[in-house]
């Protein structure tokens, strides 16, 4: 996770990116 920033930590965009990255990794 290179986008581990406080700004993307409490935003819906960060969660979406996290889910997308998780899905792409699987």
From Swiss-Prot:
Keyword Cell membrane: no
Transmembrane segments: none
Record-level GO BP terms: pyrroloquinoline quinone biosynthetic process
Keyword DNA damage: no
Annotated Pfam families: PqqA
Annotated keywords: PQQ biosynthesis
Signal peptide: none
InterPro entries recorded: PQQ_synth_PqqA
Chain positions of cross-link Pyrroloquinoline quinone (Glu-Tyr): 16-20
Pathway: Cofactor biosynthesis; pyrroloquinoline quinone biosynthesis
Coiled coil: none
Function as written in the Swiss-Prot or TrEMBL entry: Required for coenzyme pyrroloquinoline quinone (PQQ) biosynthesis. PQQ is probably formed by cross-linking a specific glutamate to a specific tyrosine residue and excising these residues from the peptide.
Record HAMAP family: PQQ_syn_PqqA
Family: Belongs to the PqqA family.
Name this polypeptide is given: Coenzyme PQQ synthesis protein A
Organism: Cereibacter sphaeroides (strain ATCC 17029 / ATH 2.4.9) (Rhodobacter sphaeroides)
Gene: pqqA
């Amino acid at each position: 996770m290179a986008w581990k920033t406080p700004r993307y930590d409490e935003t819906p965009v960060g969660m979406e990116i996290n889910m997308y990255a998780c899905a792409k990794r699987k």
